[in-house]
Design a protein with these regions (language model features):
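Active-site-proximal, Lys/Arg-enriched surface segment
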Residues: 58-117
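Residues within the helices of the helix-turn-helix
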Residues: 42
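Single, function-defining residue in the core of a domain
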Residues: 1-38, 46, 50, 57, ...
Length: 257
């Protein structure tokens, strides 16, 4: 099945209550993006496959993206997507992460995506500014909305990166879900039910490509959080941060010496 057939099928399934004219406009804009158009009003409009003049195609995309009815239907569309991709499984693996939306670092995307055969499919996402980015209240509201959209029998496994800390873990566990995350310094950990605490970096030297499991562990000495720690070091993939011109990034301190 080619991409256009999949788009037609999925869009129809998740927007069955949408007005036909608006549904056709959504499908046309999605196909425009699928054919390589940038995610801007002008580019989407120019990429619409229709006999209308270019200015009318751009106006069509502009009307759709500013349509208040489409905005009000967005939660229902996300809920339908959750039902479509999570309805047949009770333990989906859902990745949640932040990403930048623009080069100015002014807008950020918080996205929940299900992993299907190595491909992420977005279930729900929100756009935030610097004032609400990575705030506990933002995370709790996001989880509450996602919980309401998922099927009632769904108990997902949430996967997050090292940027999320114990308040996030507690919020996920409060919903009855399981979570997999990365712990990095300066977190403190205990392997003996709180009798001895050490910085997590002391475990780094023991890490190998063979996973080690530590049951009945705790993190955060001031407010212990019970968990299972797994120590694992993956083989280096040779990735390096790059500057906009493609050269390898270097710290100011290394340049001074």
């Amino acid at each position: 099945m080619n991409a256009l057939s999949i788009v037609n099928k999925v869009v129809t399934l998740v927007s069955y209550n949408m007005h036909k004219t608006r549904l056709n406009a959504v499908t046309a804009c999605v196909k425009s993006l699928l054919n390589g158009s940038a995610a801007t009003v002008t580019s989407i409009g120019r990429g619409i496959n229709a006999k209308a003049f270019e200015k009318h195609r751009i106006k069509r995309a502009d009307r759709l993206l500013s349509n208040p009815h489409l905005v009000s239907e967005t939660p229902l569309i996300y809920a339908s997507i959750c039902q479509l991709f999570c309805g047949n499984t009770t333990r989906p693996v859902i990745s949640i992460d932040w990403s930048d939306l623009d080069d100015r670092k002014a807008h950020f995307l918080l996205r929940a995506a299900i992993s299907l055969k190595g491909r992420p499919v977005t279930l729900y996402q929100e756009v935030h500014c610097n004032k609400t980015k990575e705030k506990p209240a933002t995370h709790k509201a996001f989880l509450k909305t996602l919980h309401a959209m998922l099927p009632s029998n769904c108990r997902p496994i949430i996967v997050t990166d090292a940027g999320y800390k114990s308040p996030w873990f507690r919020a996920v566990r409060a919903l009855g879900w399981d979570i997999i995350g990365r712990i990095r310094k300066p977190h403190l950990y205990s392997l003996d039910r709180g009798d001895t605490w050490q910085c997590i970096r002391y475990l780094y030297t023991q890490a190998t490509c063979r996973p080690k499991r530590f049951d009945n562990s705790q993190i955060v000495r001031s407010n212990p959080f019970a968990c299972t720690l797994v120590l694992f070091k993956q083989k280096s993939k040779g990735r390096h941060a790059s500057n906009p011109d493609g050269t390898r990034k270097a710290s100011k301190r290394s340049k001074a010496h």
